[in-house]
Regions:
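Glycan-processing catalytic domains of CAZymes
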Residues: 21-277
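Positively charged n-region of N-terminal signal peptides that target proteins for export
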Residues: 1-4
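C-terminal motif of bacterial Sec signal peptides marking the signal peptidase cleavage site
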Residues: 14-16
Length: 277
């Protein structure tokens, strides 16, 4: 998900065990998602090849040191919704159109607004200047929300493609979180947006967040699980890096996730808290 949320929650244990049966050159648990970490604690980051973070929360010195050690920073960039704690909130609030379920501090935004698109590219340039390897592009699912709201989802799709292409042109890798329906439709249209996408990141493929307030997790339904897996396989076939982010404490489910991701050569991170601390 995202978030600079809960300051008072202590970090909880995070899951990731090396699979010694996997061929040596690939380890699926080389990815860490720390989007909720708000201090400058980079302890453990050196153990990961890829980490997703709110890059503004870390010093340039630490970013540079860890990058030199082989850690690649994927900096959070929310292209599809607007959070009320961003310093540009007042400038773009009028372009929002729908509340975001389970995240009361943000609303979906009309990405067709040219000023918004320009801001996303400007922010991405700043992230690159700070040492980002790429961006963790969140809330591309605004495309699906536009469909549900009977808005011009085609225009939303064109706007998303433009943002992706322009950010990739900066020399940044683009890892898109979610957007399964967007990519499904773009594949059907034989669109060239895939040329600008480096990675595909999907949450809750195997797991499901049942209660956002109390970190209660369940199991994803078979239909959605199969759909997410099919999109992930499609992206892999197109040569993209694939990442799963799961939320669970169920040992059987954890093992299933590990086995599946390692067999498919997908990167994965398993957390027992939605805060991703």
């Amino acid at each position: 998900m995202k978030k600079l949320l809960l300051l008072l929650l202590a970090p909880l244990a995070l899951v990731g065990c090396k699979n010694t049966d996997k061929k040596e050159e690939f380890h699926g648990n080389d990815y860490g998602a720390f989007l909720g970490r708000i201090d400058n604690n980079v302890s453990g980051f050196k153990d990961y090849k890829y980490v997703s973070v709110e890059l503004d929360e870390y010093t340039h010195t630490n970013i540079e040191r860890l990058t030199n050690n082989g850690t690649n920073f994927l900096a959070y960039l929310n292209v599809g919704s607007l959070e009320n704690y961003r310093d540009y909130y007042d400038d773009f609030e009028s372009y929002t159109f729908k509340d975001y379920d389970n995240w009361p501090e943000e609303r979906w935004i009309d990405v067709t607004n040219q000023d918004w698109q320009n801001l996303m590219v400007e922010l991405a340039q700043g992230l690159k200047n700070e040492g980002a390897f790429g961006v963790y592009m969140d809330n591309v699912d605004v495309y699906s929300i536009a469909k549900e709201e009977e808005m011009s989802y085609q225009a939303f799709g064109s706007a998303i493609k433009s943002i992706i292409s322009r950010i990739n042109a900066l020399g940044l890798k683009v890892m898109v979180n979610g957007g399964a329906e967007f990519f499904d439709d773009m594949n059907d249209a034989n669109d060239n947006v895939f040329d600008s996408v480096w990675g595909y990141h999907q949450e809750e493929v195997f797991s499901l967040i049942d209660d956002y307030d109390d970190n209660v997790f369940g199991t994803q339904n078979d239909e959605d699980k199969a759909y997410y897996q099919s999109i992930a396989s499609m992206m892999k076939d197109k040569g993209k890096e694939v990442f799963f982010l799961e939320y669970t404490t169920n040992e059987t489910l954890i093992k299933n996730i590990e086995n599946y991701c390692n067999s498919q050569e997908f990167h994965y991170y398993i957390s027992n808290t939605i805060e991703l601390l």
